[in-house]
Amino acid sequence: MIQENKNFATAKAKSIRVSPRKLNLVASFIRNMKVSEALIQLTFSPKRIAKIVKDCLRSAVANAENNLGLDIDRLIITKATVGKSVVMKRIMPRAKGRATRINKFFSNLDITVTEKEDN
């Protein structure tokens, strides 16, 4: 039998209206960071997407505290994965009656927080 380690909590944000490349800049910035430090960094980040990442991180912390009873002062962000979601296709008129397609990308965010063990 495989025993699962249940000292982690996750939160997901789906269909965020930002490209995965831009979201990954913020997600890689907070990866392997303490939750308290990451919340401060996201509060003062100039990136537009930082607010949504902060809300998802708060949701993961709430899941850890309420569902699993983990200590929020010892939580670290172990995973912050970004994936592609749907692509909205739009048409932009161009010269001489032509048109080109514009792709508006959406992305998914998955944040996992783990309780740091005392060593």
From Swiss-Prot:
MF terms in GO: rRNA binding; structural constituent of ribosome
Sorted keywords for this record are:
Ribonucleoprotein, Ribosomal protein, RNA-binding, rRNA-binding
> What GO biological process terms are annotated to this protein in UniProt?
translation
Any one cellular-component term (Gene Ontology) = cytosolic large ribosomal subunit
Q: How does it assemble?
A: Part of the 50S ribosomal subunit.
Q: What does this protein do?
A: This protein binds specifically to 23S rRNA; its binding is stimulated by other ribosomal proteins, e.g. L4, L17, and L20. It is important during the early stages of 50S assembly. It makes multiple contacts with different domains of the 23S rRNA in the assembled 50S subunit and ribosome. The globular domain of the protein is located near the polypeptide exit tunnel on the outside of the subunit, while an extended beta-hairpin is found that lines the wall of the exit tunnel in the center of the 70S ribosome.
Q: Return the PANTHER family for the record.
A: CHLOROPLAST 50S RIBOSOMAL PROTEIN L22-RELATED, LARGE RIBOSOMAL SUBUNIT PROTEIN UL22M
Membership in a protein family: Belongs to the universal ribosomal protein uL22 family.
Please identify the protein, giving its name as recorded.
Large ribosomal subunit protein uL22
Source organism of the structure: Rickettsia typhi (strain ATCC VR-144 / Wilmington)
